[in-house]
A protein has these predicted regions:
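Asp-box/BNR beta-propeller blade signature and adjacent active/binding-site loops
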Residues: 1-174
Length: 174
């Protein structure tokens, strides 16, 4: 099931969802934000494309660079499509809340940001999930490099940061 759906100003239907490769569990894991486009109101769909993927960022395998809980919206003024998601880098120790060094593809440690000390106060990638946003100006065919807007949207003293997935809104005043 899609997490979010929007219709572009050109009438293209876009559905976004988590592409979970290794398991059905939530972050942390090898998860990307994927999208499918329909040009005929949902009767048929183009192949899945990946919209947000951190790959092996920071030297960690993809299973420790997961992105989940996407939100999509169409800017009704200029037609730009935005997709945002939560990126979790590495793993925090559930007892100490400290970032675990040396994670590899063979590592089996896992903690969800909502459990124990899986998320911490602060803004850094080794403290808390990061809020990333990408945009498309060509009706969802291509996407910009992700921009990290965590420092603009999360207060450093917050422990847990989890903007909800779904469909975003635009306001008349911007």
């Amino acid at each position: 099931l899609p997490i979010g759906i929007t219709t572009s100003l050109k009438g293209t239907l876009m559905a976004i969802f988590d592409a979970r490769y290794d398991s059905s569990r939530d972050l942390q894991g090898d998860i990307d934000i994927a999208m499918m486009r329909s040009l005929d109101g949902g009767m048929s769909w183009q192949p899945m494309q990946i919209v947000l993927d951190r790959k092996k960022w920071g030297g960690l395998p993809e299973k420790y660079n997961g992105i989940s809980d996407a939100c999509i919206l169409t800017d009704e003024k200029n037609g730009t499509i935005y997709v945002a998601g939560l990126w979790m880098y590495g793993v925090l120790d559930p007892r100490s809340g400290k970032w675990v060094e040396g994670m590899t593809q063979d590592s089996t440690r896992w903690i969800h940001q909502w459990h124990a000390k899986g998320s911490q106060p602060g803004l850094g990638v080794k403290e808390t999930c990061q809020f990333l946003i990408t945009k498309s100006v060509d009706d969802g065919l291509t996407w910009s490099d992700p921009v990290n807007i965590t420092a603009q949207t999360k207060k450093p003293e917050w422990w847990l940061y989890a903007p909800a997935p779904g469909h975003g809104i635009t306001l008349k005043d911007g």
